[in-house]
Amino acid sequence: MTDHPRRVTRALLSVSDKTGLIEFAKALAAHDVELVSTGGTAKAIAAAGLKVKDVSELTGFPEMMDGRVKTLHPKVHGGLLAIRDNKDHADAMKAHGIAPIDLLVVNLYPFEATVDKGAGFEDCIENIDIGGPAMIRAAAKNHDDVAVVVEAEDYKAVLDELAANKGATTLKLRRRLAAKAYARTAAYDAAISNWFNRQLEIDAPDFRAFGGKLIQSLRYGENPHQTAAFYATPDKRPGVSTARQLQGKELSYNNINDTDAAYECIGEFDAKRTAACVIVKHANPCGVAEGSDLVSAYRKALACDSTSAFGGIIAMNRALDADTAREITKIFTEVIIAPDASEEAIAIIGARKNLRLLLAGSLPDPRAPGLTAKTVAGGLLVQSRDNAVVDDMTFKVVTKRAPTDAEMRDLKFAFRVAKHVKSNTIIYAKDLATVGIGAGQMSRVDSARIAARKAQDAAVELKLAEPLTKGSVVASDAFFPFADGMLACIEAGATAVVQPGGSMRDDEVIKAADEHGIAMVFTGTRHFRH
């Protein structure tokens, strides 16, 4: 590939986001570039004292239909699409009075922002850009001759090339800008089509598109031999993608994945009702607790599995305070994420330069609709987010003994947590804290036994005479297919169980519970997580 420089003699600018526009236009004018523009962009350039030609002067045709038709004209698209070295194209341009356009600067109508503001259907429709994407695609197709800019962040790259190449752009830059241009129009169309699907309540459209904006190129993926990048999607759900990083090292792929898991889990706990803390390792909670304040919630969560918590991710549902910050800095932690933090807490965390502190502003709404996606070989699995919430469920008592008030409180707590642990999941909980977590086992019995062993290890570390599972309650993310899994929980000391129910052998499981005098409730809601 040669540099193939193309001198910029004429630029068409039409932008909704006018950030940096005037400085850019002035720099183009300094390179003797003729400025052509539309509507508000032309007015802004003219108001800055620059000479600018309205696009209607170029086309000989006025803007019409409330601005819906202004650049959809052969003299615009011919100027963008004409191959400069093609004699037939050159002859056609001369015959029809078409002037070449060497640089196109367009950012699109703010459709995504309009949707985010909760605008009505007609307002959203009016913010669907037609002429902009058409011009962008035309210019990008003809990138051998035309440079196309879709974001203000690329103004500098264009100006640097004009300065270095006597007013010309290189093919290398034009190709990079063309690739970005097509990605932008694809993401824009994805946002529109997904919005339409939501309006029409279409869950499985014939074609599904997803768009994202690069947040960060990552050093590597899950493992050092894998490449990775992090993209923001249009829904702006509070979490790691929207949070401000106040300090610490650059987030890694695994940091982002784990932080997302932690913050989604903490979103289950209403900050107005209780303080809560979640500690995550490898995308699984290893300690979760509620408390009268954050520091007590953190201590209870840490006590569940302090070994796994080393190098973990900590999520809080309230603003991080100084007392909690001091406790956290006593062990190695990768990331802290919270809605906010006090100045004193920020200063305390600041003494640990590598510790990443993220402030998300608010908590994710566990009831909010949305989609999750997972790639498979040659395909994409898409499903609605698991937005079933404990507070909306009916806990049906199916045993002779009903749970006590304290047991029911802990059962609801444990089932909140079970939703966010990899299946098969068994959670032992007591006094609004996890005391044993069994995650990701192929056998539910194994999950029950592993969680009980972890609780026993924690009791030894805390120098307790009895296992933490004694007098605890149990949550299972899915039904017990046989009584053996529940019996393992009873053997560990559990006194009450919450599970979805729905097994062919529910009667057998209920009978075993009654024989051992424990209480059991069904939710009717399963929380598989893979």
From Swiss-Prot:
Pathway field: Purine metabolism; IMP biosynthesis via de novo pathway; 5-formamido-1-(5-phospho-D-ribosyl)imidazole-4-carboxamide from 5-amino-1-(5-phospho-D-ribosyl)imidazole-4-carboxamide (10-formyl THF route): step 1/1; Purine metabolism; IMP biosynthesis via de novo pathway; IMP from 5-formamido-1-(5-phospho-D-ribosyl)imidazole-4-carboxamide: step 1/1
GO molecular function: IMP cyclohydrolase activity; phosphoribosylaminoimidazolecarboxamide formyltransferase activity
Lineage summary: Bacteria, Pseudomonadati, Pseudomonadota, Alphaproteobacteria, Hyphomicrobiales
GO terms classed as biological process: 'de novo' IMP biosynthetic process
Gene3D superfamilies: 3.40.140.20, Methylglyoxal synthase-like domain (3.40.50.1380)
EC number(s) reported in the record: 2.1.2.3, 3.5.4.10
UniProt keyword terms in alphabetical order: Hydrolase, Multifunctional enzyme, Purine biosynthesis, Transferase
Signal peptide: none
InterPro entries xrefs: AICAR_Tfase_dup_dom_sf, Cytidine_deaminase-like, MGS-like_dom, MGS-like_dom_sf, PurH-like
Gene Ontology, cellular component aspect: cytosol
One Pfam family from the record: MGS
Ranges for domain MGS-like: 2-150
Stated family: Belongs to the PurH family.
Listed NCBIfam families: PRK00881.1 (NF002049), purH (TIGR00355)
Catalytic reaction annotation: (6R)-10-formyltetrahydrofolate + 5-amino-1-(5-phospho-beta-D-ribosyl)imidazole-4-carboxamide = 5-formamido-1-(5-phospho-D-ribosyl)imidazole-4-carboxamide + (6S)-5,6,7,8-tetrahydrofolate; IMP + H2O = 5-formamido-1-(5-phospho-D-ribosyl)imidazole-4-carboxamide
Notes on the domains: The IMP cyclohydrolase activity resides in the N-terminal region.
Gene: purH
SUPFAM superfamilies: Cytidine deaminase-like (SSF53927), Methylglyoxal synthase-like (SSF52335)
Record-linked PROSITE patterns: MGS (PS51855)
Record-given protein name: Bifunctional purine biosynthesis protein PurH
